[in-house]
Amino acid sequence: MYVFLLFSRYKIFYVYIKKMAHRSRCNCNDTSNSNGSQHGINLPLRKIDTYDPCVNCRVKPHLCPKPHPCPKPENLEADIVIIGAGAAGCVLAYYLTKFSDLKIILLEAGHTHFNDPVVTDPMGFFGKYNPPNENIRMSQNPSYAWQPALEPDTGAYSMRNVVAHGLAVGGSTAINQLNYIVGGRTVFDNDWPTGWKYDDIKKYFRRVLADISPIRDGTKVNLTNTILESMRVLADQQVSSGVPVDFLINKATGGLPNIEQTYQGAPIVNLNDYEGINSVCGFKSYYVGVNQLSDGSYIRKYAGNTYLNSYYVDSNGFGIGKFSNLRVISDAVVDRIHFEGQRAVSVTYIDKKGNLHSVKVHKEVEICSGSFFTPTILQRSGIGDFSYLSSIGVPDLVYNNPLVGQGLRNHYSPITQVSVTGPDAAAFLSNTAAGPTI
């Protein structure tokens, strides 16, 4: 009797341990009984998205938390696959779905943070919810932002600057400082192709301004002569040193390499300018993209919760109502686009568990992955400079275009701190004729 009981208890214990061990390997989505009590497992089983495949269940059925064999991965297909749910991808997915019957799949490498206070609370940008040992901003947190490092900068002690990109549904609009800045028209008129000149796109800036409110009362702010003159000196020195100053030149000065002219003492400059007169470098339009709640608090308003919120997409990424032909798949890092000849036929991506998935494409693939990752995906897919792609081992070369991944121009925005004391401070601030040495 004692031997039998000992054996029975051992067997029960052995089966229980096997079940618990298997739970870490089986990804089956048991919706029939979420706590697994029918198998003697009292801890909740983690629910996963339905598109996530189940790993091989090679143990006996009675040891698996799911009472039936694991399903095969579903076959994904769409008319249009959009890669990247950032500022462009969210808008594109919304309007394509709203005004067509096309089946759309939107792939995003980051997570959906609609209920994450780190994203939704405007103060989350400054690290309000960080633990004490993580004194970093959201854009410095790899859970919310890509952290690609540039090549060493010989002009900055060979440091490798990091240019953060949003890693979330909403892209960088989910992690930025909530300032809206109207660009200077010179950049668009001098450097952008036909159809993208400032007057061509000005109407879109006007639409944005109609939808948001400035953080300050009124539309204008006083600036001192000292600030204006100091900035003009910086621009003049940049010109004399041969440094491009495209973003310091503006319409108001007739193309001269300085910023707004001073007049009538301290001038009044319109910061809410969509004519492109004000300089990107000199002035910011201090708009804050927020929604005020009934209790007086604010939440971040960004591309994700504006175009893909719960009115249009459910918590599992499936579209609702008119948007039922849209599917948003987050935590999906795109591997590459596959071609037959020069026609895109599928997109493969890797989920957060390392499983590889394929999406069949009937019409188009739209890459909305930003200025860094769009060329990266193209190159991995065999589109780019063949000599370079061959050197890094890209297997299938599709289209030879040496310009892919070249010609990036970024508005570099370093922070310079200067410490002066006594008479030097007054001279530094008042001697605008000579200006600071840079």
Swiss-Prot record:
Superkingdom of origin organism: Viruses
Subcellular location, record wording: Virion
Signal peptide start-end: 1-26
UniProt cross-references to InterPro entries, sorted A to Z: FAD/NAD-bd_sf (IPR036188), GMC_OxRdtase (IPR012132), GMC_OxRdtase_N (IPR000172)
SUPFAM superfamilies: FAD/NAD(P)-binding domain (SSF51905)
Co-factor requirement: FAD
Pfam assignment, any one: GMC_oxred_N
Protein family (similarity comment): Belongs to the GMC oxidoreductase family.
Protein's name according to its UniProt entry: Putative truncated GMC-type inactive oxidoreductase L894
Protein species of origin: Acanthamoeba polyphaga mimivirus (APMV)
